[in-house]
Amino acid sequence: MSYPQARIGVIGGSGLYQMADLADTVEVQFNTPFGPPSDALVIGTLAGERVAFLPRHGRGHRLLPAELPFQANIYAMKMLGVEYLLSASAVGSLREEYRPRDIVFPDQFFDRTKDRPSTFFGGGLVAHIGFDQPICTELAHLAAEAARGVELIGETRIHTGGTYVCMEGPAFSTLAESRLYRSWGMDIIGMTNLQEAKLAREAEICYATMALVTDYDCWHPDHGAVTVELIIDNLHKNAENAQRIVRAVVERLHAAAPPCASHSALKYALLTQPEDVPQATKQKLAAILAKYPAYRPEV
């Protein structure tokens, strides 16, 4: 089956369930080798580019962080031909200067999740990708510069760099955990982006996180503990800013998409010899392995 193609993908998190600026849209239902993604993907035109949008938790926010079909979500983007993927995500701040309604483009992750699927490989094919720089530097820089060039509503500030600690959830942090993460030098905290970043790297998709700060987690002595009401309220206030930034990022990618090492992440990562890989595994990973002829499934 052939699918409409899109070079740019956007994953929307809590509070960002649609992209109103997309024109000429089509909705595509997927059934990937890893099951269906969180929801149908909406593909449309924005600033001269075809863009694929996926609401991470599904429309209606139906999926817990640990229930997200991370593999299917990224594989669906790969099937559409996505090369650049921007992920919008609600986060708590672990630093005084990262205020609620600020936006952060982090450059590192720290994993505190438990047994979530975070690789496409196995089943007779071993691969080890480089992940020392989990965020694609070129895309994150482009996105941050685009954000700084946008007229933002309110007092939103743009920050670059920092570490996103990915917690299991769905409960928010204890005070002890929040204080510990701060003592470790972590900057923001969320529940979803680490697995996306790993899988995007394996799929050779350039990936960056746009983290929307909603709260101070629970460490701040002058702010109450985080609540869903607080998160959603700040996300709604910042939704228009997020939409404006996404448009600006797409415009810049349309004008001059940067080269990215992620686009060849598998070049030296595949360890198993092609003749030793089961045909079923080659077929399952066909979209990811397509540019490596020796690993393509037999017709």
Swiss-Prot record:
One of its GO terms (biological process) is L-methionine salvage from methylthioadenosine. It comes from the Bacteria. Keywords: Glycosyltransferase, Purine salvage, Transferase. Phosphate binds at S14, R56, H57, S89, A90, T192. Pathway: Amino-acid biosynthesis; L-methionine biosynthesis via salvage pathway; S-methyl-5-thio-alpha-D-ribose 1-phosphate from S-methyl-5'-thioadenosine (phosphorylase route): step 1/1. InterPro entries: MTAP, Nucleoside_phosphorylase_d, Nucleoside_phosphorylase_sf, Purine_phosphorylase-2_CS. GO terms for molecular function: S-methyl-5-thioadenosine phosphorylase activity. One of its GO terms (cellular component) is cytosol. The record marks S173, V228 as: Important for substrate specificity. Coiled coil: none annotated. Catalyzes the reversible phosphorylation of S-methyl-5'-thioadenosine (MTA) to adenine and 5-methylthioribose-1-phosphate. Involved in the breakdown of MTA, a major by-product of polyamine biosynthesis. Responsible for the first step in the methionine salvage pathway after MTA has been generated from S-adenosylmethionine. Has broad substrate specificity with 6-aminopurine nucleosides as preferred substrates. Homohexamer. Dimer of a homotrimer. HAMAP family: MTAP (MF_01963). NCBIfam families: MTAP, PRK07432.1. This is S-methyl-5'-thioadenosine phosphorylase. It comes from Gloeobacter violaceus (strain ATCC 29082 / PCC 7421). The gene is mtnP.
